[in-house]
Amino acid sequence: MILSLLQEIDEICRRNKIEYYLSPRLTLCAVEGHPFPQNPMFGVVLMKTADMERFRLAVDEDPREKRALESMKSHKWFSGFYLRYTNTDTLCLNLDNTRDYAFPGIGVSIFPLRTPAASVKAERRLSRDENAWTELCHINHAERNFRSRVNRTIMRLQCMITGRQGQAAHLYDRLVRFCQQPGANKYILKRRKQTTVFPAEIFAESKRVTLEGAELQVPAKTAEYLTISYGKNYKDAKEPRYVTSIALVVSARVSYTQFWKESGNFEKYCKERMKNARKLARSRRHKDYFNECWDYVEFCGERMNLSVSYEKQKDYIKNLYKNEDYMTLERVFRPYFKMMQKSLQKNELFAEDEEIFDIYVDVLEKTGKTVQRSKIGTLI
């Protein structure tokens, strides 16, 4: 199914003289003769930003039966700056993110090869707005820090003013306009969890390769393309074993409309599932916070026990220090050194006894352990 969609994309691109490239994973399969990936989400091609917009317009002008092209221009819950070319007579639905696509069928994602924006300021503003939009679409997985909350609030206000669909389309147009600067020396592939930077020369030319009997297009400099994506040993890269997610429903025989009908009140089901997913995400955050607190309690207990141990050795340590036996003191302070390292990672000092602490700091200087000594100096 994905292969047939790739062939259709190839046909549309050749007819309209649009350049495209198979994703690094599919290119590796074609070049090294690996089997086609089983994961239905691995159908990916890349296009330069301007070419991606031309492709969108070409499909809109000549739509095909049982096919849909989705983007932020057409769907107010579309979560990112890319396109998705879908077979609407199939089913590929993530039950935890039911709003992602208006047509949740098996499809091919078309990701843009972006150029950096004309200025650093514009780049930061675009990145801020794009991240805020993505987090609004997947609120259960959003960052919880102050800056992210502020950015999401601003995006919500903009959605209230222009409407959610209007804001999505406006953001898409901005990204298209600013991410296709002429004369750029690099292209950026931005995915949800990974960003890859390619030299522009890699995409200067293309060539045809065979993938599962179908002729498709990849960058002419295939070796460089795959080396950046997988490293020098890309030929040894293995396809990860695919295990279907519990939340993913996939079928090439049943359409998403049939699935919705058989599910009864699907809208109600989606709302309940999203509500439960929100509760689960909240409980996970509480659990993480509890685990963090418990780890800190254990750390404090460990530190207290060690301080009691050194309190018992205090006279012995003072005698060694008086006799300037720094070799023995270094050995005695090894557990103290490790505990100090852990404390410094938390921006704290292990200084339960000031007298022992002063001796320890002097021993650090005498034994040449200047790195930890300088870190302690910044906190004193």
Task: Describe the role of every protein-language-model region.
Residues 10-43, 47-53, 201:
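Active-site nucleotide-donor binding segment shared across nucleotidyl transfer reactions
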Residues 1-14, 56-128, 132-229, 236-276, ...:
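Conserved catalytic core of two-metal-ion nucleotidyltransferases
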Residues 300, 340-344:
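Alpha-helical junction/boundary sensor with strong preference for TPR arrays
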Residues 319-322, 363:
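Residue-level signature for tetratricopeptide repeat
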Residues 293-297, 328-339, 369-380:
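Alpha-helical repeat scaffolds
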Residues 307-313, 352-355:
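Generic helix N-cap/helix-start motif at coil->alpha-helix transitions
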